[in-house]
Amino acid sequence: MSTDSKSLFRSSVSNRVGQVRPPSNPFAALLVVLVSLLGGCAGLVDKPARPVLYDFGPGTATSTSVPTRSLRGAVVLADVEAAGALDGSAVLYRLGYADSHQLRPYAQSRWSAPPPQLVRQRLREQLGRERVILNPGEGAALARSEGLLPRSLRIELEEFSHFFESPAVSVGMLRLRATLLENTAGGEKLLAQRNVVVRRPAPTPDAPGGVRALTAAVDAAAEELSQWLAQVP
């Protein structure tokens, strides 16, 4: 073989060796593919929706005052009592046309506070337009300052749900028991008791409609209780 042929052969071999690349790491390649797939899937997953919070609205928009002479009609409003699901924050409904014994929660709707707290707040506001409404523990202060023992009003919330009579027709249903007690030196004395049942139509067959119907039911119950308290001697 001539010198030129040998040089040409060495050059050809050298070029081929330079073009050969070591094989890539198969595990690294697989990792890149998996990361890409996971990133794509993450973009497809929706974030969980936050529940919508409801209450009874802002209430009275103007300031009110009760004359001092109304102290003799002052009432201590105890905490509203409720049991079971009514003491939670879920907005509940019943399908009267299917199974009225089953309470069902709206999946994405919640009360801003348990219904007993919201009901007490609304009753205090509505009843306070006609008389002095005191919190538990404030009656003793009134007794010391005015020599009066205010009566106590206890409320038991028994039903508070969005009731569907049919898929398109529904009402806000409220049922409560009110007990009026006289505070005496010898203890509490039962004066009167009243069962209040209110149904108010819902404007729409959904959670917002149920909330509006239940708000109207609470206001109607407060009006009924106000008239009842005025009639008890």
Predicted features by range, described:
Residues 43-64, 130-185:
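Surface-exposed short loop/turn segments
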Residues 124, 128-132, 162, 226-233:
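Sec-exported extracytoplasmic/periplasmic mature domains
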Residues 71-76, 89-91, 115, 149-153, ...:
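Envelope-exposed proteins and targeting segments
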Residues 25-32:
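Sec-dependent signal peptide recognition
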Residues 42-117, 232-233:
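A structural "domain/chain start" motif
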Residues 92, 102-110, 184-227:
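Short secondary-structure boundary motifs at beta->alpha junctions and helix caps
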